């Protein structure tokens, strides 16, 4: 069809993730209700998900993202091979976090050279979380970060919660996490509390070595920026030494692809 116009409402919608180009995939979803108006040139939709989820292959190590609730207003435009999508008033919650965001996405310019294809595209996303489970931070680190980095965060953060979380992703997703600042931004900053941080997790220690004491009851600022991770201005203590309190703790991994930790 060269021209069409559709208006309708769908409930209980489930769409499987599908192949698109060169190993890239389209996302899927489940448990959705959609009120949509669309033509061949684009459209708009009100999206609600209850006890469902999104499927994001190629984005996270765990591609299925369960959602207790999600609501969003979505618009899109189609111009030949070029696609653009804007999502506003996005509010979401699940067992790991609760927050809101806004985002825009478009296909990359395939005419820029052989390393470029239309997908995974160019993203501009900003959002906030009012609550987050610190032990699940690793689950939301993108696959563009090395597995060793993501697994270090998984094994090092043993407990804790976060509030006032700010996150930003801006740039061609092919370049994530944007180690060259001219390519874009990738940043997550959060106020954390009651954190237990095993900065040398047992799996990184030699067999038979005595364990390094974890930092406990940490409260401060946790920042992921490009390929780095930092703990700033934290207070806390060491496991097994309840009478010792620490102030102004600073911990840094300058490059998560090489897990070298500095703690002051």
Residue ranges and their predicted role:
Residues 1-86, 97-234, 238, 243-264:
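Membrane-proximal interfacial segments on either side of biological membranes
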